[in-house]
């Protein structure tokens, strides 16, 4: 194909442009006749069949809820750095809700805002990429559910999702966010009162998340951050996980069946730090979502604690141990990390 040699800004600009295709010599060797595709008499370079220049880069951003509602209602608060909370209904066609407003926050204040400076209470079904890339200072609270890529690239913001009051099902047994939630998250918090789909927290490098169950390939390629799962995991959990920590409630003692052990180890929770970490994360989860499962665990914590497993990458565990040793010698946290890295590298 010659298409790769032609500068185009959108795939749409290539639609109908068979004049940009050329036949490779090998095609004739395999007796392939591509003339019906390449010799299209209806192709007109000036007026392509499907591509319409009028639609070029028209993403109709003015129709998004960010432009129509968030930037309108929160403009004064944004300009004056005032705390503000608003409510809004969302639908599953509202993609990347919060992202444009989040970009305006970042432009003005970078990551200097306090948590919950702007709180948006949403009701309904969140579209794809709900809360993607939202920064420090922005909290999105969703009563309902959300599609795939929930919290994609989370960058310091806070996401809370829980089902409406009066539901007749158990939240911890039902999916509330779709696949690939928190993909590539770098910082921030997410509290999910229900089950997430497949590939939860893939490439998470610094966010903290609490969820009540995940599908297959959870925490895949994770490099940092903390994840607490107070429910079941799907198969191939922690595949390629090289950093961060996952705490999993293994009530049926069968996590080993779904855990990918190539790069991680599973161990009981014994250190005081880990115990407090789990308790604090569940406490926050209950405070934000009113999770019944979370309350059940807190009310009988001594019973549930032995059922938790700590999933930690082998090399990450070595690094943490070495950093602790260096700090014990009086080095600062930053110096300890550097020295630990080089000492492990030297072997």
Describe each model-derived feature in a short phrase:
Residues 2-7:
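Short, small-residue-biased leader/transition segments that mark boundaries at the very start
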Residues 10:
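Conserved, mostly hydrophobic/aromatic
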Residues 15-18, 36-347:
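Long, distal/terminal scaffolding or interaction modules
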Residues 19-33:
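Short glycine/threonine-rich loop-to-helix capping motif typified by GTGT followed
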């Amino acid at each position: 194909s010659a298409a790769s040699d032609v500068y185009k800004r959108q795939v749409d600009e290539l639609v109908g442009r068979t004049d940009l295709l050329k036949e490779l010599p090998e095609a004739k060797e395999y007796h392939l006749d591509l003339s019906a595709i390449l010799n299209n008499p209806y192709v007109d370079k000036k007026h392509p069949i499907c591509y319409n220049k009028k639609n070029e880069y028209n993403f109709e951003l003015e129709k998004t809820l960010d432009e129509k509602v968030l930037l309108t209602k929160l403009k004064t608060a944004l300009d004056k750095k005032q705390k503000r909370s608003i409510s809004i209904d969302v639908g599953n066609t509202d993609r990347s809700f919060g992202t444009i407003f989040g970009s305006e926050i970042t432009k003005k204040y970078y990551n200097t805002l306090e948590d919950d400076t702007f709180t948006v209470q949403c009701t309904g079904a969140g579209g794809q990429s709900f809360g993607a890339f939202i920064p420090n200072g922005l909290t999105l609270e969703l009563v309902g559910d959300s599609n795939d890529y929930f919290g994609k690239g989370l960058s310091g913001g806070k996401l809370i999702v829980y089902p409406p009051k009066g539901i007749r099902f158990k939240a911890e047994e039902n999916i509330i966010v779709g696949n690939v939630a928190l993909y590539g998250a770098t910082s921030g918090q997410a509290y999910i009162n229900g089950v997430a789909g497949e590939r939860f927290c893939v490439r998470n490098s610094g966010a903290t998340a609490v969820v009540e169950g995940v599908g297959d390939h959870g925490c895949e390629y994770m490099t940092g951050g903390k994840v607490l799962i107070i429910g079941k995991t799907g198969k191939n959990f922690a595949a390629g996980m090289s950093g961060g920590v996952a705490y999993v409630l293994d009530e049926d003692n069968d996590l080993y069946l779904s855990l990918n052990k190539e790069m991680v180890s599973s161990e009981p929770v014994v250190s005081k730090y880990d115990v407090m970490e789990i308790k604090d994360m569940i406490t926050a989860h209950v405070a934000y979502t009113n999770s019944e499962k979370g309350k059940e665990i807190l009310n009988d914590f001594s019973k549930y604690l032995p059922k938790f497993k700590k999933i930690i990458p082998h090399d990450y565990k070595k690094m943490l141990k070495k950093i602790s040793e260096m700090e014990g010698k009086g080095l600062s946290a930053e110096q300890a990390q550097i020295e630990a890295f080089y000492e492990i590298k030297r072997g």
